[in-house]
């Protein structure tokens, strides 16, 4: 089921609270970044309400990056209390190349923009889809991944067409492109909204909804590890760019990230990231070149 071979390269390169923190000098390894128990939601490395420039981050010796803690295999905390995933691997490399310590702060989908607007983090690396609406509030760097939407449902009543959901209940996570897409295109679908991905998957497993929609990369990975569920809609909507985001107007940090993504193409970094964090999950079911973006070129 080479699902991602269906994803066409149609976008130009985008140039545009429980909180757990983690500190690491690790540079892009697959060993994970250890999570520790700060539950304040604030970081001493960030001045609230005012973003930090590249020079200020370097002077502080620490960069704060917002990631998911419950979206396996992209950003999650494992059984040993360490952050893992595709986004985390990239975050570790950013800190290494900047020569600073890494602090990871978990974010929810609906809080990603707010964490940048209030400068709670320096960068968001949390499966952040580039949209025009979001780009009015934050600045997106070049993309490093591409996705569409997918729909997962129980084997006993597989949803193969979104129109089948009219009059039924679809589980979504607040602040995601899935929420926006179904609100705009399928008004007769009843949306059951959750703040966190683990809440949404629990609701699906408990039968509180007929299906769940989010990025197809995510639902496919989840279905592979949860027998009894099928991704009946493998690619829905546009092929979208996933990119890092910084606070609006933080030009020095944005330029550094764009330069970093461009330079990392020489070593095929994101293919290595895929091999370290995603290959074991997807196996032969995914063509990595249909997901991975190198050098910001979709």
Locations of the language-model features?
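Extracytoplasmic small-molecule ligand-binding "clamshell" domains
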Residues: 32-38, 42-127
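Extended ligand-binding regions for polar small-molecule ligands
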Residues: 24-26, 35-48, 88-97, 176, ...
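Short helix-initiation/N-cap motifs at beta->coil->alpha
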Residues: 103-114, 157, 174-177, 192-202, ...
